Amino acid sequence: RATLPARIVGIGGSVGKTTTKELVADLLGTVGRTARTAGNFNNEIGLPLSVLGVDRSCAFAVLEAGISHPGEMAPLRDVLRPDAAVMTTIGPVHIEFFPSVRAIAEEKAALLEKLPADGFAVLDRDDEFFPVLRAHSSAPVVAISLADPAADYFGEISPSGELRVREQATGERADLPVPPPGGFMARNALAAVAAARQCGAAWGALAAALAAYRPVGMRWAVEDVRGWTAVNDGYNANPVSVRAALAAFAEWPVAGRRFLALGPMLELGGREAAEHEAVGRAVAAGEWAGVALVPRQAVAEPAVQALAAGLRAGGWPADKTCAAPDAAAAAEWLRARLRPGDALLLKASRGVRIERVLESLKQES
């Protein structure tokens, strides 16, 4: 690490780290050659490999630091030794191993503790734990917000659907495209824009890079399946990201009806039942043509039962719900209902492998 001339930007947070890492790397690529974490090689094994993989010709390296247990961030930070950092939304991810979400924020904030004085930390002023993160930063804080016009970078969605950004330091404004699916991506894009502007990126180059961005992996991967649209957002799931995906899907342009295939959110510990029931209630408040609940292993598992309980408590009709025993059964239920013009959102934690539903649906019956 000490031999690398690249300016290293560390990416931390609970929700959207890999997407934000890709965005920051794409935008910094308009300034100079930029390395990035391959996939999500972000733990005690993957992060050192990521550092070792940075070419000495790179001007920047955007590397992700991910933790799941207390005490893990400081060693990662000391390997990474970032020159700057970007923190995404903090939420109850891996809450099974922490006493509270605040404890998660405190752990992740360790990434900010040894930033150089000439570096920066991009933090979301709208995040509940902004004060916690700010208190840990040893570098100047660059605040972003979609609500507070006084932030260093204030963003709002224009009537045409673009992200209208105002840079406080210069007074400059720019209308930038929001990567698909829009909605929650505006916050990730604003953080990436703030980081890139701190490193000298030009507005025009940022607009072009955002317009060219495409999601990676099973992150809002859109494909046509015999006339209906599959939106595979099954890379991972937590209470924050599921609600964001539901909101984005509700606004997604669809000619026909919207269906959901939902699976458990893992590593919620003692909050598992309450969080799944709350998500079930949130689903029940939406306008969907049908909801398939997909278990990790068996329909009787508590997370699926809690989702179903939340749906019932929210008044969701039983005839529009399928509590499937497995992915194949969920696919059969959906196959009988999906028609050309419809759309299906798939969302669950990685361990559920909810893409199995889509794989079954793509097979001819």
Region annotations inferred by a language model:
Residues P92-F98, V231, M265-G270, L346:
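A short acidic, helix-capping loop that chelates divalent metal ions and anchors anionic groups
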Residues F60, A84, A191, L338-K347, ...:
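Short SAM/SAH-binding signature in class I
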Residues I11, G217-W220, A343, G351, ...:
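ATP-dependent carboxylate/acyl-activation modules
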Residues P215-M218, G234-W316:
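Active-site beta-alpha connecting loops in nucleotide-dependent enzymes
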Residues D319-A330:
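Short acidic-hydrophobic, aromatic-tinged amphipathic segments that line or gate anion-handling sites
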Residues I11, L47, E64, L76, ...:
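Residue-level signal for inorganic ion chemistry
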Residues R1-R125, F129-S137, A336, E359-E364:
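Phosphate-binding loop of NTP-binding sites
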Residues V86-T229, R281-G290, V299-G314:
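Acidic, Mg2+-coordinating active-site environments of NTP-dependent enzymes
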